[in-house]
Amino acid sequence: NGKALRRVVVTGLGIVSPIGNHAAEVAKSLREGHSGIVRCDKYAEMGFRSHVHGAPEIDFDDHIDRKLRRFMGDGAAYSYIAMGQAISDSGLGEKDVRDLRTGLVVGSGGPSTSAQVVAADLARQKSPKRVGPYAVPKTMCSTLSANMSTAFGMRGLSYSISSACSTSAHCIGNGSELIQMDKQDIVFAGGAEELHWTLTVLFDAMGALSSKYNETPQKASRAYDVNRDGFVIAAGAGVV
């Protein structure tokens, strides 16, 4: 109709990562050149080629009520914490978050693989009745948007995009478009990923993970270096 696209700005952000569990901590780590990549002995014991990963140091019990946590895999839990930070950082109130014009576009590369394996093991080794109803919100591909929209009582547009390592970028881009096209006034966007051997083994089998720097894990993540030999798997969440 010839109308100019609306301007989009970032008013708040939240992050959980191997180098900090808050924006200020992450910024400090980046300035000081701190690496969150460490050796994982479990990978070595299991016979993986890659023995390094990045794991956030955070206690979910300090941040998430047990009744909410039972619906979440670790990725959704990271996302919940990051989104809470983004809400606080933006200065938005509960009424703003629950407004029909406030949306949510968050995703992950996949569901909670650890929850999938646990459910399968329970069904095979004990009984399907032991799996329980909480496995579904952990293992569906829209686990992040389902958990976040429910936990924060959101009523606007809400869905997940999953596109491998581009997931969060696509979610943020799509969230921006929703505002530009006047479909929403506010959108929370980003992504999260859990860290568990059940996911790591898949990329290790592909030969996609770094294995040359197992004894020097802090040097393993070097995406644009001529001596790179794969990516380093890690966990965390980021929401704007």
Q: How would you label these PLM feature ranges?
A:
Residues N1-L68, S90:
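ACP-dependent fatty acid/polyketide chain-elongation machinery
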Residues A4-L5, N21, S35, C40, ...:
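Acyl-thioester C-C bond-transforming condensing/cleaving domain
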Residues K42-L92, V106, C141-R155:
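A glycine- and small-residue-enriched flexible loop/hinge segment at structural boundaries
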Residues G103:
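Conserved catalytic-site loops of classical short-chain dehydrogenases/reductases
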